[in-house]
């Protein structure tokens, strides 16, 4: 059996159940070392491998999820697969569940989406949340949070999709770690840094 552990949003978010699963694992594999929550793995001092190289070898985001799932599945029983945020929200975990026909154990963690929604100020209201990797596949509405904005190119793709719906002059919040900055949408791909913790929120819908 393969176990999936959600590492949460930052160091210190790992649950005790997740911690014990990692410590008892025959092998530990981590989706990415670029997320802040990766510190929860390094703090345990266990041997592990990271799958960041698969990002570069994947031709599309759909291929990425399948390639990650394939790599984890091939490691076999006794493997613990660690992802940032809540494991149930991760698209590679969904692909792994399909590949394994549901024969995985999921230990959830602190939700990346919930943390971003709080920073965006959407608590207490209805909102839409979507990964930047799947944004082109859904019907957009606001309030909206788009997460997983891992690099400048992806931020540019997000900008174009949101501009088609809301207009490039629309004010949005650029979120990255503790930073929450209001910017016009057309500046989304001009920020200093990006990463697994980077996101953008649109507060209200102004249809073109």
Where on the chain are the PLM-derived regions?
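Class I S-adenosyl-L-methionine
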Residues: 1-107, 188-191, 198-199
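Beta-strand/loop-alpha-helix module characteristic of Rossmann-like adenine-cofactor folds
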Residues: 2-5, 102-208
